[in-house]
């Protein structure tokens, strides 16, 4: 029977049952409640074998922080194909329909967290940001520079956290590429729920707020996985999210967490790769960081995507871009920045460099430079100084960071 790929309609429960099956899980009632509360049904795509859903793809409508601006972005999620229907081209057909719809909607970029990064490079996604997972033994966690707290830290319950955390997050968003807007429903159903199967053996979540002169400017959410032996406690503190509007509040929160008694180790699986913790501890060797892929970014519509972010300096660049899956992006493009305002248009001028659309996805938020990609044999310099010219334009001051999987 022919597989029909089309916009989803109908009862969402079979859709999410297919999502769970594709990821090797079974639908829980609380999982369905969580999905249904934030599901954008009008943006979902399904593959049907008869009446049965065998493939799924969804989208969150986000505003994404990009260098110097925010842009509408499609947050691609719940993408899967049942094991019974793999290797039939279903994913490719869903990606085709989805990217066409994203472009038609006017979203110049799409982002996702990938279960397997190799999959999405076929459809033009590039490695848009990294995350750092850290492990630090508490007995070797002394800070290098003595630090007097600049504010206070207090515990809050989930209801009070829900009133305080969003404003702090939103204050940081425009300053950190990779942050995306969180709707009230996203906070309620994606961040604050604390079911046991989300805890991975740890206890319930704790929430703390940092305030300077009485004004909240940072927060942390963490869990403790208890572990005791004859020598005493050696529990692990897992940092779920730590966000602050200024460096002092960030360090105060880290000092508070590291100072909690009965803890043997502090772990955080998703920090910015330029988080100040690594340079703050006296023994950086004892802070073990494992860097991994985070956001994958697809430049869906090249001209508005490049015109929608800001650049480090004025200048101009001509690029030859290859894009097999979205051919409207392929060709020679001129980027001109004058008085901080970018202009992007097709051109017949000679290019200074050549790249694939996946390379622009890796460069767009500032995770990598053109020179780095050239060293990896991905970007080709076609005119002397082309790489330096490109990096002078696209360079950023902060590493991109996406603190939340979606």
Predicted regions mapped to residue ranges:
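Intrinsically disordered, low-complexity, positively biased terminal segments
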Residues: 1-13, 49, 66, 144-406
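Glycine/alanine-rich phosphate-binding loops at beta-alpha junctions
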Residues: 1-78, 82-84, 89-92
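N-terminal membrane-targeting/anchoring modules of bacterial envelope and secretion proteins
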Residues: 45, 53, 57, 79, ...
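Conserved acetyl-CoA-binding loop-helix of GNAT-fold acetyltransferases
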Residues: 76-100, 246-258
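Conserved GNAT acetyl-CoA-binding A-motif
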Residues: 95, 100-114, 261-272
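Conserved active-site alpha-helix within GNAT-family acetyltransferase domains
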Residues: 104-109, 113-133, 252, 273-288
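Flexible glycine-/small-residue-enriched beta->alpha junction loops
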Residues: 127-149, 156-157
């Amino acid at each position: 029977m022919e597989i029909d790929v089309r916009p989803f309609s109908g009862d969402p429960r079979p859709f999410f049952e297919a999502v769970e099956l594709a990821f090797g899980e079974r639908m829980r009632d609380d999982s369905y409640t969580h999905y249904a509360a934030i599901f954008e049904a009008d943006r979902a795509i399904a593959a049907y074998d008869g009446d049965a859903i065998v493939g799924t793809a969804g989208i969150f409508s986000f505003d994404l922080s990009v260098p110097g601006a925010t842009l509408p972005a499609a947050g691609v999620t719940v993408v899967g194909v049942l094991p019974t229907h793999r290797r039939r081209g279903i994913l490719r057909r869903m990606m085709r329909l989805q990217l066409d719809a994203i472009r038609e909607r006017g979203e110049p970029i799409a982002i996702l967290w990938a279960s397997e990064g190799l999959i999405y490079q076929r459809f033009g996604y590039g490695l848009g940001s990294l995350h750092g997972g850290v492990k630090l033994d508490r007995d070797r966690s002394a800070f290098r520079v003595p630090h007097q707290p600049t504010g206070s830290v207090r515990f809050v319950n989930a209801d009070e956290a829900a009133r305080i955390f969003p404003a702090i997050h939103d204050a940081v968003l425009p300053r950190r590429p990779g942050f995306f807007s969180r709707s009230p429903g996203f906070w309620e159903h994606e961040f604050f729920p604390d079911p046991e199967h989300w805890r991975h053996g740890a206890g319930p979540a704790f929430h703390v707020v940092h305030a300077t002169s009485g004004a909240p400017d940072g927060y942390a959410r963490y869990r403790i996985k208890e572990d005791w032996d004859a020598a005493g406690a050696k529990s692990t503190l897992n940092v779920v999210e730590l966000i602050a509007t200024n460096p002092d509040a960030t360090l105060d929160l880290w000092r508070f967490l590291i100072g909690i008694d009965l803890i043997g180790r502090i772990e955080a699986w998703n920090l910015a790769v330029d988080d100040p913790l690594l340079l703050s501890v006296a023994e950086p060797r004892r802070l073990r960081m494992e860097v991994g892929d985070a956001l994958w970014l697809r430049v869906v519509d090249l001209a508005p995507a490049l015109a929608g972010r800001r650049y480090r300096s004025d200048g101009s660049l001509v690029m030859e871009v290859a894009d097999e899956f979205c051919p409207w992006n392929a060709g020679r493009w001129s980027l001109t920045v004058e008085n901080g305002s970018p202009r992007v248009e097709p051109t017949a001028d000679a290019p200074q460099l050549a790249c694939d659309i996946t390379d622009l996805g890796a460069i767009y938020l500032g995770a990598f430079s053109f020179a780095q990609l050239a060293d990896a044999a991905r970007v080709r310099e076609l005119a002397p100084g082309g790489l330096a010219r490109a990096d002078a334009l696209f360079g950023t001051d902060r590493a991109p960071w996406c603190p939340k999987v979606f």
